[in-house]
Structures are given as C-alpha cells and as structure tokens.
Amino acid sequence: MKVVDTEFVISAVSEKQYPKDDLPEFALAGRSNVGKSSLINTIVNRRKLARTSQQPGKTQTLNFYKVNNELYLVDVPGYGYAKVSKKQRAAFGEMIQDYLETRADLKGLILLVDARHDPTADDINMFNYALYLDIPILVVATKMDKLKKMEASQIKQKIGKSLDLKQENVSFLPFSSVSKLNVDKFWDWIEDKM
C-alpha cells in the first residue's frame, strides 16, 4: 500500500466519539514505550504524526489516524506502566475492552512486543484475549535494530515460547522504526485483512 494521505482524526474515550464512516480499523496495542507511536510514524512516513515520548503512559485515549481515506489505525493506551493509578489503569482497561468487544469495524489487532525482552504477562493476556474474541492478530517485534544478528535470527522462536504464533489467525513480523524493516510486509497484512 502506498500511503499518500494520513491524518489524526480524534482522541476518543467512548463509542459515541468513534468515527462514524465505517472504514476498517486496526488497533495497535502493547506495553507503554514499546514503540506504537514510532511504528505509526514510520509506516505512514510522517515524522511527527503520532506524538512519541520518552515518558511511558502518555497515550491515555484511543487515537484514530485515517490513512488514505481507506482505514484507521487506532493507537490504544499502553499497558503495564506502574506510575498510573489503579483507578486510571482500570479505566484504560475498560475503554480498551469495550472497543475490542463491540467495534464492528475492527479488522485486526497489531500487538507490539519489544524484541529485546520476553513478552510480559500483559502481552500474553492481550494476545489470548484477542484470540478469544477471534480478532486477527499481527504480533510485531519492535526495536529489532537493537538486537545482535544472532538474537534477531531467533526472535520468532523466542517470542513463540510465550505467544502461540502457530494459531490460524496469527501472523508475526519483526520490525524496526530505525531501519524501516518490514514496512511493506506490515501493509501487506493490513490489505489482506481489509
């Protein structure tokens, strides 16, 4: 897919705020600071469309980005950040759960995991939850540029120990925002699910 136009549309916290134009949507989930905003900026070739931060927990709403007037990428709040209150964490969880369970336009979940670390308990829970909801999943191993060649060659096996990548509705993609590794394959997956 050639990206010619991308725009931030809305930050939403409830269904009444979601876009109403029935375009396919793809949610990006992962722990805080896993690289969701960097991935968005890289795949649409815009440096500052999605705000990146060194401070975890910045995204606190569902952020809808329209691509080519054909689809939405939906950046959801990162999970696992300890400095967010339990009350806020519960609210984020409820907002994400409502979105994943009720949004008819949702065509896939892009689950980002940091290639340098094993998937967290939260990653495993999100993965299993999407499987339960029968949502197609693309597991994206971010920050591949930070791995040594030997580590990079074994990344699918490493992540596959925690996440069942052999499930029918699951795909896997190593990714780097620095080297732009697999941007085309990312869009191939999106187009296949539309």
UniProtKB/Swiss-Prot annotation:
Which residue spans adopt a coiled-coil conformation according to this UniProt entry? none
Q: Where does Mg(2+) bind?
A: 37, 59
**Could you tell me what this protein is called?**
Probable GTP-binding protein EngB
Q: Where does GTP bind?
A: 30-37, 57-61, 75-78, 142-145, 175-177
Q: What does this protein do?
A: Necessary for normal cell division and for the maintenance of normal septation.
The EngB-type G domain extends over 22-194
In alphabetical order, the GO MF annotations are: GTP binding; metal ion binding
Q: Which InterPro entries match?
A: G_ENGB_dom, GTP-bd, GTP-bd_ribosome_bio_YsxC, P-loop_NTPase, Small_GTP-bd
Q: Required co-factor?
A: Mg(2+)
Extract one GO cellular component term from the record: cytosol
Q: Which UniProt keywords apply?
A: Cell cycle, Cell division, GTP-binding, Magnesium, Metal-binding, Nucleotide-binding, Septation
Give the gene that encodes this protein: engB
Q: Which PROSITE patterns match?
A: G_ENGB (PS51706)
A single GO BP term for this record reads: division septum assembly
Residue intervals passing through the bilayer: none
What species is given as this protein's source?
Lactobacillus gasseri (strain ATCC 33323 / DSM 20243 / BCRC 14619 / CIP 102991 / JCM 1131 / KCTC 3163 / NCIMB 11718 / NCTC 13722 / AM63)
Which Pfam family name is an example for this entry? MMR_HSR1
Which family does the similarity line name?
Belongs to the TRAFAC class TrmE-Era-EngA-EngB-Septin-like GTPase superfamily. EngB GTPase family.
